[in-house]
Amino acid sequence: MKIADLMTLLDHHVPFSTAESWDNVGLLIGDEDVEVTGVLTALDCTLEVVNEAIEKGYNTIISHHPLIFKGVTSLKANGYGLIIRKLIQHDINLIAMHTNLDVNPYGVNMMLAKAMGLKNISIINNQQDVYYKVQTYIPKDNVGPFKDKLSENGLAQEGNYEYCFFESEGRGQFKPVGEANPTIGQIDKIEYVDEVKIEFMIDAYQKSRAEQLIKQYHPYETPVFDFIEIKQTSLYGLGVMAEVDNQMTLEDFAADIKSKLNIPSVRFVGESNQKIKRIAIIGGSGIGYEYQAVQQGADVFVTGDIKHHDALDAKIHGVNLIDINHYSEYVMKEGLKALLMNWFNTEKINLDVEASTINTDPFQYI
């Protein structure tokens, strides 16, 4: 399996297009044409993680957090530059799966909920998928070759189906004027043409490409086409809602997930003895969604990186919070390993996958 093949597989199951616009996901360092010798999953790509990959003979690291986030201005032999230089020197490919793994139905938040032993887990804060229905009008004799070109360039595809067009016949009319150079008709004379309206669906990211292809392959000098926006609720969403088996107190639940996640500290906001049943989870830094979680029926909102003023606001408004630290996302190492092994087995790909044993939590606890 080459890196390009791995990227295609990852994009199929955890689409990079579902990442936030500000994020930096995908192949950050590497060569798509090289063969994968093994995959190491990690929360962060630190120097220790790179050394671990080298020791195992694996040339591919898939990290959750992007090593390259802001603009890199230099690659010196220290700090992040040292890590990047070592990756390049040892021909190690680095792939980041960040917010696209966060919003995935099988991603980080699902992994956290399962690690906490919760049930009835479902995605919340669903994204809106944007599609376009494309309409254009073309002379009857040109329909076949035109559709062929669109299909060859990846348009008019629906899941496992290609060449997905709808046609309806009609009669078009126009009058070329001035410096027009018409394919059909004469200057200053109204022309009537038997035309076919062709309709097909595209994803939002294909819009500019579709416009380019229509202009390139349409026989008319100035083709007419429409893009009609359609929105649908996506399967992807930031966070999950889940439940405990039996109602328990806020303090007992906080202690329980601290033990199950095996993390050194947990903080919570709210009355210790308050009973909870439904839990909303956004791993990493999810503050900003706590009030929405309550509106969706959550008794407590679980996330990390909670700041003092956000916690105080929540307390004043009676919103229960549990801070499980950002590093709690480490569960994705084993979680992603399991997903990869399942995908590889399905595709009959024989490739070693291991979860990094390196603890990349920058904090020390006393």
Curated annotation (Swiss-Prot):
Transmembrane segments: none annotated. This is GTP cyclohydrolase 1 type 2 homolog. It comes from Staphylococcus aureus (strain COL). Belongs to the GTP cyclohydrolase I type 2/NIF3 family. Zn(2+) 2 binds at H65, H326, E329. Keywords: Metal-binding, Zinc. It holds the Pfam family DUF34_NIF3. Homohexamer. Zn(2+) 1 binds at H64, D102, E329. One of its GO terms (cellular component) is cytoplasm.
